[in-house]
Amino acid sequence: TLGNHDFNYGQETLTDYLNALHARCLCGNVRDENGRLPVGSYTVHTLKNGLRVGLVGMTTSWINLWEKPENLAGLSVGDPFHTAVKGALALKDRVAVPVGIYHGGCEKELETGKTLSETDENIACRLCEKLPFDLLLTGHQHVAMVNQNYHGTHVVQTPANAVAYVKVTLDEDGRFESELLTPKAEAV
């Protein structure tokens, strides 16, 4: 999905990046009036073993507050919760594993449920409380988070600047395990 800093360099740079990406970008709450940004809302991916995984992507709407207006001209960044609801409904009964990909963080402590923020900048906990995601991949707060569960959803987040990534494994009994791994650089 897209993060707030993906908009910092203007739409031409963002469009070039997305067109060169060897993947499909899912960010359903970003709308482009000109139709240049190649982003979708959700997709279904069937693994080699036949398991159907549904992916729904969204980003924090606070991009509207932080980004330069010229970088958002012709774009709208809507409510990520509304996008997640629409995506979850579209995937219902079509997939075995619904996954949310959200560039936003947790508004509550996952262990205690204690509120950390009253704003809607970060709504990961609300997504877990209200929607049937089995896995929620989060970002934005840059807090390393693995093997966390909130309201039945496995929640992960990577630290900043790609210093580590999260490997998530789903076992045959439907249980998730996640671990933080460090990328290895190799000379080319």
Question: Could you say what each language-model-derived stretch is?
Answer:
Residues T1-A187:
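Acidic, metal/ion-coordinating pockets
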